Amino acid sequence: MHVRPTLALPAAALAATLTLTSCADANGSDDGAFTFGLLYPQSGSLAFLAPPQIAAVDYAISLINDAGGVLGTEVPPPVQADEAGDNAQANEAANTLVNDGVNAVIGAASSSMTQATYDTITGSEITQCSGSSTSPELSEIDDGGYFFRTAPSDLMAGPVLAQRIIADGHTSVAIVARADDYGTGYLTAVEDELNALGAEVTLSETYDPDTTNFGAVIDGVFRAEADAIALISFEEGTQLMAALIETEVDSTFYLTDGLNDPGLDETIADRRPDAIVGTTGVAPSADNPAFNEGLRAFAPDLDVFQFAPQIFDCVTVIALAAEAADSTDPRVYVEHLPDVSRPAGTECTSFAECRDLLDQGQDIDYQGASGDIDFDDNGDPTSATFEVFHFGRDGYEILDYVDYSSRED
């Protein structure tokens, strides 16, 4: 579980401040420009998320610099490091960012890579914020209070997907998921909600993400005879979907953010263009046309926008925390991160607007590009917006946006 750092030193430990100061360069110094590190997948199954992550970070920094930078100093381009979807390489990349003395790390992309790197980053007392890691297990990590995320936990996403399945009239569901932090947490959330809604879960099964043989899974799904199939996967899920379609399984597919790809119908159904017509999915998103238009203007070649609002918010909310603390040192500004997104403050929607309110001595409630973040004590957002995407006869479309909150009213 998160433990918030205690930053004040007792008198008896005053001498230790000399040591602490000497280590400043290793954990984000307070000596000028605020430098972001970006830990993202240039290769691997989530490499398609790299372009929107880079664009969102650069876009956020450009708006911060247009407003005068952080504490009046221009923010330099982010230090980039490739986590490649591999634990060893991710740790090497995280160490590179730590040794470069960045003031904050944005990333990693997947929950597994965040699990593999948070100890290196937060253990060095550097703030880490992921805009796309959604595993519920990340709410319970021992990070000293330095890990935050703007992507909602799958404990929110699971119920939204389950409710959509039931709303579409299905009463029996087969759930298949990756056997990793992302897949198992999401599966549990979906299954619990389906059970609560009175649906019959005829199959609940995980598979090795590195497998190339889905025979046992396909057999299990076929025997489950469910109305709907909830598939919780990344890129490898296209192979499983294609194989299930070949067996002519008579079920409707429901997907998660890992397969939120407008070109999925072309990837899977070369021989049967209508094979995934009717497929629906749920993914964290933002019902924010103004942000989307701004990002398109900033990065006109960008064609994947998934998690871009959440990544943008990681950068912006950290910069605002530094402004509120009057410090770029993560050991100082980290305690202000929850405060700049709390409902007790004055609502504001941009770095410039929020910074000006802080300069006037006001508390702020940053309303992010992805929605009202409102971090809880675990560094998780307590509200989120999800898009319901769909493949119809005319191709990919967004059917609806669903707001979900974990707050107890």
Annotated model-derived regions:
Residues 2-10, 17-409:
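Extracytosolic ligand-binding ectodomains
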